[in-house]
């Protein structure tokens, strides 16, 4: 190796030429690959493999060895006689040979903790299966065979493979690594965090003063039946003389206030609640029916309906019921005639039963289009543009 020390003093180009001279691939020589190329070139010149020195320097690592053992039975010198129609039988000497000679276990441990960090103990079991290759037909040897009872009859050895040698290996980990326990949630049900309930701030309520009012009875002797809505929203009739609102033990409670004033403003004047006055019973009232009154005066959450039914009626007519009667057009027409010039007034819907002329239809169409698209504005714009164009053409001299 002393004669090859000159390779370290060669330049990159000279070293590349030396590699090509000895049949090595022309790899560019750099500072990082220079030492590797010099080592390969020395191995090529001396004829020594590159990895021989490395393999010799390394320590021998113990490897697991598997020992296979087999026991071959020698044929007996005694004559063999075949007995048809009988099951397979073995002598006690053959059983002893199989149990003592043909089965052995080699168990040893390898200390390879430096490689994998754990020691593995390997157990190899070698069995001789050559003696189990007999045919289904039995062969009986002329030797004294002891008589076995059913309880003491020897058990036949069952083979697990077709090969002559059965190898069983058991691997057991001596030191198992300890894994950290994963944080498994106890429940997958989301629990809402408990937040203390906020205090409720009740708004001030304004209860108007309840004053009894009189109801004017009609001169015709008719009295309007009292309409009262019970808790079950059912309406029934009873004689009006049996109920007196002044004698009720519980005063009616007003739960509705129509005031929309701000909190800091002055309180509005409470509107008095009208109450009906008892009217003597007449024959016509009995014919109409009687109003069943509840035991206590109940004021529902419908003050508008109560005010509607509390309005006085001078005509003395009975309660109005829904009927499909024709609507009178006279008050509607008079209303629109009074408010004709009002900005919010609508035109009356008048149905013309006679046939409308085409000119009237065209006029109505033009009016509707003018209201929707402003046709007058566009018409004036087009006419003005045409007039301006004509004036420009007349005043411009001909070229």
From Swiss-Prot:
It comes from the Eukaryota. One of its GO terms (biological process) is cell division. The chain crosses the membrane at residues 377-397. Residues 4-48 form the LEM domain. Residues 68-77, 89-99, 233-256 have a biased composition (Polar residues). It is a single-pass membrane protein. Disruption phenotype: Viable and fertile, with no obvious phenotype. In the salivary gland nuclei of third-instar larvae, there are increased deformities in the nuclear lamina with 1 to 7 abnormal O-shaped Lam-containing structures. No significant decrease in adult survival, however double mutants with either Ote or MAN1 do not survive to the adult stage. Double bocks and Ote mutants larvae have small brains, their imaginal disks are reduced in size or absent, and only 10% of second-instar larvae reach the pupal stage. In bocks and MAN1 double mutants, pupal survival and larvae development is unaffected. InterPro entries: LEM/LEM-like_dom_sf (IPR011015), LEM_dom (IPR003887). Residues 49-103, 119-141, 233-287 are annotated as: Disordered. It is found in: Nucleus inner membrane; Cytoplasm; Nucleus, Nucleoplasm. It holds the Pfam family LEM. GO terms for cellular component: cytoplasm; endoplasmic reticulum; membrane; nuclear envelope; nuclear inner membrane; nucleoplasm. Its main location: nucleus. The keyword Coiled coil does not apply. Keywords: Cell cycle, Cell division, Cytoplasm, Endoplasmic reticulum, Membrane, Mitosis, Nucleus, Transmembrane, Transmembrane helix. Inner nuclear membrane protein. May have a role in maintaining the structural integrity of the nuclear lamina. During pupal development, plays essential and redundant functions with the other LEM domain proteins; MAN1 and Ote. Also has a redundant but important role with Ote in larval development. This is LEM domain-containing protein Bocksbeutel. It comes from Drosophila melanogaster (Fruit fly).
